[in-house]
Amino acid sequence: MKPLLDVLMILDALEKEGSFAAASAKLYKTPSALSYTVHKLESDLNIQLLDRSGHRAKFTRTGKMLLEKGREVLHTVRELEKQAIKLHEGWENELVIGVDDTFPFSLLAPLIEAFYQHHSVTRLKFINGVLGGSWDALTQGRADIIVGAMHEPPSSSEFGFSRLGDLEQVFAVAPHHPLALEEEPLNRRIIKRYRAIVVGDTAQAGASTASQLLDEQEAITVFDFKTKLELQISGLGCGYLPRYLAQRFLDSGALIEKKVVAQTLFEPVWIGWNEQTAGLASGWWRDEILANSAIAGVYAKSDDGKSAI
């Protein structure tokens, strides 16, 4: 295989530079050494790669095919070399990032672009989690790092975590929903009369639960907050939504915010990671997320106690 790789490199340089002399300078070898290497492969395989009948060697059809396919091989080999070096330095081959469904994924797009500009050898895989499902993905080994997780972190030294801030939630209904006309603050007895729209917990351990669902309250359980938002706008139910997700619909009048007795508006939000398996890619994402001003803005409180968005 090594002689073939050498020939592929020679053919690539020859086509780019135009002559054996120029190619030899690029490869730091003599023209005769390059010519001998190519000729030996031709002899071993009983093929002709170059037509040497003219002043300059020209590629035969076989030579052009080997050049074209060979460049793909060279690219793969070079990427493999870079990947091996990066892995040796501590960069993961793959990084699985669990993203809680309440987290605004669009804020990760600039970080993905920045990461791949310099660290393309690490493949990124994103998975979704809801409520306890985000922590579950981390503790069960399905994710290397999670972002936007709510509720309390696990009490194990295997995992590290840092608080991103607080997620503000608002109780919202459509203007034509019966609760829109009820006097504020709404009490639980009144809310319980109407169907809730909830997002199901994706935790695998134990029974899954739905957040802020009252006892014996009728509910539709959906798989993400985008669907929950759509159903509440349609008037099919009521419930809490992240303020950043609901705000433009509150501003347009598609939703109405209602105050609720003894409501908890802010939920602590975390980033967590596996201390045992964390490499350089995990560290890069942890640092960038914690330093990102746009992400901080989603989870920051303003002076009036509301989300800073």
Swiss-Prot record:
Residues 1-60 form the HTH lysR-type domain. The keyword Zinc does not apply. The keyword GTP-binding does not apply. Transmembrane segments: none annotated. Residues 20-39 bind DNA. Pfam families: HTH_1, LysR_substrate. GO terms for molecular function: DNA-binding transcription factor activity; transcription cis-regulatory region binding. InterPro entries: LysR_subst-bd (IPR005119), Tscrpt_reg_HTH_LysR (IPR000847), WH-like_DNA-bd_sf (IPR036388), WH_DNA-bd_sf (IPR036390). Keywords: DNA-binding, Transcription, Transcription regulation. Coiled coil: none annotated. GO terms for biological process: regulation of DNA-templated transcription. Belongs to the LysR transcriptional regulatory family. This is Uncharacterized HTH-type transcriptional regulator YeeY. It comes from Escherichia coli (strain K12). The gene is yeeY.
